[in-house]
């Protein structure tokens, strides 16, 4: 009798994706982040579901409903902080996952990569709308500033902003629709993640060498299931420490003040994971230019496969490209720091230089260096 996992219509999908899947024998821990992102998504959907049971999306009661969750609901504080810090863990895993893809040339699987870029946009949109829901000062002003950026679009801009707001300012209609979208988008993300995996399993995984691993495959289970469990345990340990010891480490104190349209906070800034893009936005004095740069800072990832000029796929054997990659990482960390600083000297000029370097590295310096490396190897 054939094993049920190979014959049952549902089981055989799971079997071919997580059990008998042929995987390269040399993939490192950098390949763990896909499963970690899956775990993060599950944590976010579950904690979010329980929060939604107690949350009210009304401007008069939103802030107090979050307070009620933390004070009166059994383990409500735990659920709330798991959800808030779970988002931070989600983005840490996302950035490392994208960084791995850039370093090892995984973007050559263009369908998988482009679905990934789409996923990144969807997660960013979800996180932004989630940040508005507690209806604190930074929620309100963050929503006002970011949605207002759309008014830079010629001709339709101001109508578009009013259409998103559902009125002439960020108010009850905005909060209600943001809650609705924040609830539905994670399920869209889950579906997209399924498509992401579908395209990945068409080609099989990349590996650190960037060479074909068809000659040397091992089954996903037990080798990579055990390896993934280690990653999951580390993720849960870090998240638990964050939630139990310093739940507000990555948050903004301004969000503990109820939203007040008459009082602007001295420094409006988004959550830490958007600061790099926010710094790029602020570094351009023109509103439309800033918005375009903001969108391009993420959208540029979609053009990475077209900018690949090297004869080798991975950066494993390309020391010059490796140096540039780590300069890019340092540049992004600099942008993240600048995004959280006030708009004054010397932060303005540092932000502008870091923004220019970011685009120069990805669009010009790295492709030219790849050609130079080809030349060195007489390829």
Swiss-Prot record:
The keyword Transmembrane applies. Heme b b562 binds at residues 83, 182. It is a multi-pass membrane protein. GO terms for cellular component: mitochondrial inner membrane; respiratory chain complex III. Keywords: Electron transport, Heme, Iron, Membrane, Metal-binding, Mitochondrion, Mitochondrion inner membrane, Respiratory chain, Transmembrane, Transmembrane helix, Transport, Ubiquinone. It comes from the Eukaryota. Its cofactor is heme b. Heme b b566 binds at residues 97, 196. The keyword Heme applies. One of its GO terms (biological process) is mitochondrial electron transport, ubiquinol to cytochrome c. GO terms for molecular function: metal ion binding; ubiquinol-cytochrome-c reductase activity. The chain crosses the membrane at residues 33-53, 77-98, 113-133, 178-198, 226-246, 288-308, 320-340, 347-367. Binds 2 heme b groups non-covalently. It is found in: Mitochondrion inner membrane. The cytochrome bc1 complex contains 11 subunits: 3 respiratory subunits (MT-CYB, CYC1 and UQCRFS1), 2 core proteins (UQCRC1 and UQCRC2) and 6 low-molecular weight proteins (UQCRH/QCR6, UQCRB/QCR7, UQCRQ/QCR8, UQCR10/QCR9, UQCR11/QCR10 and a cleavage product of UQCRFS1). This cytochrome bc1 complex then forms a dimer. Belongs to the cytochrome b family. This is Cytochrome b. The lineage of its organism: Eukaryota, Metazoa, Chordata, Craniata, Vertebrata. The gene is MT-CYB.
């Amino acid at each position: 009798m054939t094993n049920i996992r190979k014959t049952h219509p549902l089981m055989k999908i799971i079997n071919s994706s997580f059990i008998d899947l042929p995987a390269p024998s040399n993939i490192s821990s950098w390949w763990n982040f896909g499963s970690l992102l899956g775990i993060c998504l599950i944590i976010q959907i579950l904690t979010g579901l329980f929060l939604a049971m107690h949350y009210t999306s009304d401007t008069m009661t939103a802030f107090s409903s979050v307070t009620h969750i933390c004070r009166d609901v059994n383990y409500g504080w735990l659920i709330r902080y798991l959800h808030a810090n779970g988002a931070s863990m989600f983005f840490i895993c996302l950035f490392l996952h994208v960084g791995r893809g850039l370093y090892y040339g995984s973007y050559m699987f263009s369908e998988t990569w482009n679905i990934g870029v789409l996923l990144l946009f969807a997660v960013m949109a979800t996180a932004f709308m989630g940040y508005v829901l507690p209806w604190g000062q930074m929620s309100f002003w963050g929503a006002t500033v970011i949605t207002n950026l759309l008014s830079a679009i010629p001709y339709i801009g101001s109508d578009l902003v009013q259409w998103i707001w559902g009125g002439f300012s960020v108010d009850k209609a905005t909060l209600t629709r943001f809650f609705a979208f924040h609830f539905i988008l994670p399920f869209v993300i889950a579906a997209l993640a399924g498509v992401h995996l579908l395209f990945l399993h068409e080609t099989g995984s990349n590996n650190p060498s960037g060479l074909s691993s068809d000659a040397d495959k091992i089954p996903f289970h037990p080798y990579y299931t055990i390896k993934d469990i280690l990653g999951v345990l580390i993720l849960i340990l870090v998240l638990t420490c964050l939630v139990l010891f310093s739940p507000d480490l990555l948050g903004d104190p301004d969000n503990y003040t109820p939203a007040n349209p008459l009082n602007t906070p001295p420094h409006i800034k988004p959550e830490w994971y958007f600061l790099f893009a926010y710094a790029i936005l602020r570094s351009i004095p023109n509103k439309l230019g800033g918005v375009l740069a903001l969108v391009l800072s993420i959208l540029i990832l979609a053009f990475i496969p077209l900018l690949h000029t090297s004869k080798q796929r991975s950066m494993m054997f390309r020391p010059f490209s490796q140096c540039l990659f780590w300069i890019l990482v340092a540049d992004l960390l600099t942008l993240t720091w600048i995004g959280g600083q006030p708009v004054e000297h010397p932060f303005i000029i540092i932000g502008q230089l870091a923004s220019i370097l970011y685009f120069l590295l990805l669009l010009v310096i790295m492709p030219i260096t790849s050609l130079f490396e080809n030349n060195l190897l007489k390829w």
